[in-house]
Amino acid sequence: MTTAYRFDNLWSLRAPHERVYAALADVEDYDHWWLQVREVHRIDGERARVRIRSLLPYTLDLVLTRAVQDEARGILRVDVAGDLQGWSAWQLSAEGADTRARFSQEVQVTVPMLKRAPSAIRPLLRGNHAHMMRSGERGLRKYLT
């Protein structure tokens, strides 16, 4: 089974670009509005340890390292290490008074148990991610109001 995953999600948010960018840049606050983000602990000025659990009975343990933080271009990108290896990024664009936030992620699973899982569970892992992203969008919308 391949252990590589690529995700692309688009959120439409009724909030100005600056507020959305500030909320997404503040990883330490994710667990206040994103239910699946269970814990966030800052390691230093560039890194945070994040524990994530969606529907499946497994908690991902990740270290996110800031790679790009460019508000003028609306880009946030982190390198991902731990149970997943790769990167995640937000690309924001203003649409009038609203903001579009595109989340992109390319990761490899590093957890031996998940690496050995049959390809039949790939749809479950994708569904788990989709649920987490829908919940995050709802949480951020509420947080921004």
State each model region's role.
Residues 31-32, 41-87, 100, 135-145:
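Glycine-rich portal/gate segments that line the openings of hydrophobic small-molecule binding cavities
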Residues 9, 37, 62-68, 87-94, ...:
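Hydrophobic/aromatic beta-strand elements that line small-molecule binding cavities or substrate pockets
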Residues 80-135:
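Beta-strand/loop substructures that line and gate deep hydrophobic ligand-binding cavities in soluble
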Residues 15-17, 70, 95-97:
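Short loop segments at secondary-structure junctions
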Residues 1-45:
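Hydrophobic ligand-binding cavity/cleft-lining segments
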